[in-house]
Amino acid sequence: MRDYVLRATSGNGQVRAFVATTRNTVEEARRLHETTKVATAALGRTLTATSIMGLMMKNDSDKLTVIIKGGGPIGTIIATSDSKGMVKGYVGNPQVEVEDYPNGKLNVAAAVGTEGVVKVIKDLGLREPYNGTYPLVSGEIAEDFTYYFAVSEQTPSVVALGVLTKEDEVEFAGGFIVQLMPDAEEETIAKLEENVAKLPSITNMLKEGKSPEDILNIVLDGLEPKILDTCEVGFMCECSKERVKTALVAIGKKSLAQIIEEDKKAEVGCQFCNKKYMYSEEELLEILKEM
């Protein structure tokens, strides 16, 4: 089944909702980076949220990057999305292992850490990208995005993100972001709070085979949910030999000349998709000449 995000509102327009199924996206990330279960969960949750946040942007050329540094053994988590919800991402230590919670659930916070920041960079085509840094509040990812929306955008939000992995494969992944609009009335707020209070976990809903449409109807029960559109999303890296070349330029003339002299070739990998690019001595000399 393809990955997609539903964009919806309540009948009165006072609540907006984004509900995603991202199993293929997260599985592709797991396959490319060979992540452990807990790293897959941390990266998968971040990719799902980043994809939805990408769809919140207005212009086609807008780009969004999320960087999570929690001080934990997973290292830095980086995810980036375009305005169509197409994402890519990676973690510093894809082989991280931590003890599960006593109930058997993955302890994502132990891998991510709880002392750190969430950084959100929005490139809206202006001279300077918008750059915001916010404290990490839990390390479980969903709560951290909830806090980000409350503080950065003054938008009360409910964020739920889930990834379920069996053996070496992602079984289910998805999530939702539901937000109150500034004109939301008490009645709407009370109903949404009532719904959220009795919600099963997103992982359980996905495990039960519930589609984004089903989840939307549960979250916005009694609020007449109205689907505005359905956006197909996925993992996409637009790297190329030409783009990756910037890494060779960045090391400087002296280091590049040393590589040419000692190795006569260079291999450069893309961090987002792990694709490797080989540069021959001739190509390296050409790059050096252009510097």
UniProtKB/Swiss-Prot annotation:
Keyword line: Chaperone, Cytoplasm, Disulfide bond, Redox-active center, Zinc
- Superkingdom, taxonomy of origin: Bacteria
Please give the InterPro entries that the UniProt record associates with this protein: Heat_shock_Hsp33, Heat_shock_Hsp33_C, Heat_shock_Hsp33_N
Which SUPFAM superfamilies does the record cross-reference, listed alphabetically?
Answer: Hsp33 domain, HSP33 redox switch-like
User: What does the UniProt record tell us about how this protein is modified after translation?
Assistant: Under oxidizing conditions two disulfide bonds are formed involving the reactive cysteines. Under reducing conditions zinc is bound to the reactive cysteines and the protein is inactive.
**Location in or out of the cell:** Cytoplasm
| Disulfide bond in keyword set | yes
Kindly list the biological process annotations in GO that this record carries.
protein refolding
Q: GO CC: one term?
A: cytoplasm
Query: Pfam family of this protein, just one?
Result: HSP33
Task: Spell out the disulfide connections.
Answer: 237-239, 270-273
Q: Does the keyword Cytoplasm apply?
A: yes
CDD domains documented for this protein: Hsp33 (cd00498)
What are the GO MF terms of this UniProt record?
Answer: protein folding chaperone; unfolded protein binding
Give the protein family.
Answer: Belongs to the HSP33 family.
Instruction: State the HAMAP family in the record.
Output: HslO
> Main role?
Redox regulated molecular chaperone. Protects both thermally unfolding and oxidatively damaged proteins from irreversible aggregation. Plays an important role in the bacterial defense system toward oxidative stress.
Protein name, as recorded: 33 kDa chaperonin
What is the organism of origin for this protein?
Answer: Clostridioides difficile (strain 630) (Peptoclostridium difficile)
Q: What is the lineage of its organism?
A: Bacteria, Bacillati, Bacillota, Clostridia, Peptostreptococcales
